[in-house]
């Protein structure tokens, strides 16, 4: 089941925010934001109140019109990928894409507004030491163990460009399984046992430039 979350600011707490759902959910989600070398470091800590399979996704809206933007995922996507065949990931298929981090040479997504000459990037900070098998390659899948792989990408939210990222991995609207082959989307769920916590960190950077 999918639970839309809202960010609630905290006071007198180690964390800056708590992600809350309208209904009771079996996990607490706290978020801390710090500034490191002019970059915002976002740390999310999930703690299970009972055994739960989870997939966490966060979106950060820019102030960029999606139609004014170019996009970058290292080794996978450049600008709008319109030079790629229609059977490959590109704007021919969709203007919103999220992919497994191991599709990329670096787990980074960049959005550049050509009119404002501004950009925003997100990069995951993690050690990639393990992966887990799943019985299926599409739809909602349960992982057999623990993975290090999350996802990253960009989305069109009502005409506004947004960074999208999360854990464990997800690929949408299609999965690129091999050269010139698009398959249905996949969302992986990992077990978090009662009392266990997982900490996830991403780094957000904003700036100005003439191009990528």
Task: Indicate residue ranges for each PLM-predicted region.
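Beta-strand/loop-rich accessory regions of lumenal/periplasmic or secreted enzymes
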Residues: 1-194
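Short Pro-Gly-centered flexible turn/kink motifs
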Residues: 189-211
